[in-house]
């Protein structure tokens, strides 16, 4: 079986290659950005016509931080729309039997109920700072739903929660909270600092899923005979930012103290995915946060030593 993994150079795509690369009956097909521009419709069409994969996982996306999303919303909307539309349509045209499109928890309304269920999609305004990216991901989800409805193809979507793991982005300004903490505490330990400052009260609660668990969930979903049109993927458990920070400090070996600045903003008090549907189907995350952080820190050190740190 030929499996095309779009976006294999990213954190998620890398985990998917690790997960499926060891299966004897699976031939993983992948292309670098230089080899295949997924925004280019003609190039994508030619690729599917030549390779004719049996299955596809769309993990490719143009991603960035709040500043980039706010400054270049047209680019984020256009590029991510093009990636979704080109891959989904060409997959349909060239006989792909199964396609899994990966979205994001940002598709749900800013003031969605917590935990966020799948059926709260399109029930309220989105978070303005990443609206363009979210709209593109919603469109990809709906394309899969409508191609399935109209043409009978088994195209479906998965919406993961906050992800972390090997190959993450550790940029000091543009990374997400968990990899940013890993880098900050590693550098503080190396510099012998006695104190690290943190924003806010530390009380907001967040959910984190190791990327290898996401890859396992994708394999599980691709084995289902009749999967939902879209489904949340997460741990179903949460941790305070304070608890996360203390765990990262311990894992990195930082011996100093953490000081909190309550004058700084906290952000949303809670953001958690409702994973009851996936649990009912028989899948649960296996990697707990402490274990996942230890694996992530080990990969961070290896990537840094090899000069391959994404930053």
Question: What annotation goes with each model-predicted range?
Answer:
Residues 66, 101-116, 132-138, 149-150, ...:
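Conserved catalytic-site region of short-chain dehydrogenase/reductase
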Residues 6-7, 11, 15-19, 187-311:
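C-terminal substrate-binding subdomain of Rossmann-fold SDR/epimerase-dehydratase oxidoreductases
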Residues 81-87, 136-144, 178:
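Conserved catalytic Lys-bearing alpha helix of Rossmann-like short-chain dehydrogenase/reductases
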Residues 98, 103-104, 141-169, 179-182, ...:
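Conserved beta-loop-beta element that borders a ligand/cofactor-binding pocket
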Residues 85-130, 156:
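Conserved Rossmann-fold NAD(P)-dependent oxidoreductase catalytic core, especially the SDR/UDP-sugar
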Residues 21-46:
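Adenosine-cofactor binding site in Rossmann-like domains, unifying the SAM/SAH pocket
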Residues 129-133, 161-176, 200-212, 235-237:
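Glycine-rich "substrate-gating" loop/helix at the edge of Rossmann-like oxidoreductase active sites
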Residues 41-81, 93:
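NAD(P)H-binding glycine-rich loop region in Rossmannoid oxidoreductase-like domains
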